[in-house]
């Protein structure tokens, strides 16, 4: 702070915990309190941003209420739920979170991700990233129910994207999934970490 820091982001886990266990919101609150005391004495304001275990919009609001932090940084939660920022902003403003995007909109997010990778990096890198990320994206796909009321899953889609050689292969797989194909297998559920 004394060296000119304008904000502090704190992840409420130790290095040893990595991604396991539950974020320590009490620890974040203690940092918020200590920074606040220091700043009041120095006559300036340095906001503390809390991070960890923000997977749903309500988690962001709970983080702010529990810790007193000025804002929330969202990390891994956004990998499977890219619209989490939109939802969290609504909930923090006291509004209801918007409905989850429809399947076509979710697939368009994957297409945009791939498009941005291609725009800013080369095709090899983009294809490596989309093959890695499809499992994260897949956690929110395939939530439609079959005739028995069970989630249909998207394992065949994930497998097809992982085997894709070119962007056109990814787009073809997404098109087929949207049309009702590449369904089945177990739904991937987000591990509680």
Residue ranges: model-predicted function:
Residues 1-7, 19, 26, 30-50, ...:
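Alpha/beta catalytic cores of nucleotide-metabolism and tRNA/nucleoside-modifying enzymes
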Residues 10-20:
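Glycine-rich, proline-tolerant flexible connector loops at the mouths of alpha/beta enzymes
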């Amino acid at each position: 702070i004394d060296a000119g820091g304008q904000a502090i982001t704190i992840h409420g886990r130790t290095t040893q915990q990595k991604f396991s266990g539950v974020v320590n919101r009490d620890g974040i609150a203690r940092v918020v309190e200590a920074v606040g005391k220091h700043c009041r004495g120095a006559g300036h304001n340095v906001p503390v941003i809390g991070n960890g275990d923000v997977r749903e919009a309500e988690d962001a609001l709970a983080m702010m209420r529990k810790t007193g932090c000025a804002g929330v940084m969202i990390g891994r939660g956004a990998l499977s739920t890219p619209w989490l920022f939109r939802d969290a902003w609504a909930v923090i403003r006291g509004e209801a979170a918007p409905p989850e995007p429809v399947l076509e909109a979710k697939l368009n997010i994957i297409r945009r991700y791939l498009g941005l990778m291609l725009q800013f990096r080369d095709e090899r890198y983009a294809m490596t990233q989309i093959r890695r990320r499809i499992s994260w994206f897949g956690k929110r796909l395939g939530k439609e129910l079959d005739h028995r009321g069970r989630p249909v899953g998207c394992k065949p889609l994930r497998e097809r994207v992982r085997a894709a050689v070119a962007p056109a292969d990814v787009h073809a797989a997404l098109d087929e999934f949207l049309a009702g194909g590449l369904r089945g297998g177990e739904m991937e559920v987000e591990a509680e970490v």
